[in-house]
């Protein structure tokens, strides 16, 4: 677990790149595959001689709180602006994310415990959003602005990053211009 700025992995701004095209993959590969796999392993080895070092588990928590959850609507719902070619897949509405990965983290560490517990409460519908922030994920050209009563984001691109993913096997052919400043 380390920063991999300019390469595949966690970027210094807590976004995630899965490929060298530098397209934002924080929600898909960075959350669903990378962070959750590390979180699961941290849970398996918590309290043993194999537990993650404080530095590494803290980086994982920071990645969840300052990267993944800040690119989600209130840390609860997927932000459509972060999705790539999979945005063309049909879905049945918007669902709250679960709490399993957070509960596992809290067994591994108490670092930033209050913030993690707030996300659990939000996801269970036991609290209302209180966090206000504006964050530009400069490695992936994604800007998020949140207040307790609203959330908005803008997806952009630059000369450093690809606009969108390549349209592999058809998905994504209609999404090329989404990063021309799409606002959600």
Which residues make up each language-model segment?
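Extended polysaccharide-engagement surfaces of secreted carbohydrate-active enzymes
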Residues: 41-184
């Amino acid at each position: 677990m380390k920063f991999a700025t300019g390469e595949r992995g966690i970027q210094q701004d807590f976004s995630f790149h899965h490929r060298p095209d530098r397209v934002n993959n924080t929600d898909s590969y960075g959350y669903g595959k990378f962070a959750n796999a590390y979180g699961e392993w941290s849970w398996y080895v918590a309290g043993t001689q194999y537990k993650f070092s404080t530095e590494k588990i803290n980086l994982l928590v920071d990645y969840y709180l300052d990267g993944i959850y800040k690119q989600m609507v209130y840390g609860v719902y997927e932000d459509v602006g972060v999705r790539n070619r999979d945005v063309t897949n049909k879905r049945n509405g918007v669902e709250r994310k679960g709490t399993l990965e957070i509960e596992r983290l809290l067994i591994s560490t108490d670092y930033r415990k209050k913030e993690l517990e707030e996300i659990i409460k939000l996801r269970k519908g036991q609290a209302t959003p209180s966090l206000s922030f504006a964050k530009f994920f400069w490695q992936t050209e994604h800007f998020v602005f949140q207040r307790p009563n609203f959330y908005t984001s803008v997806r952009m691109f630059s000369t450093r990053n690809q606009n969108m993913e390549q349209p592999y096997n058809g998905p994504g052919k209609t999404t090329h211009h989404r990063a021309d400043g799409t606002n959600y």
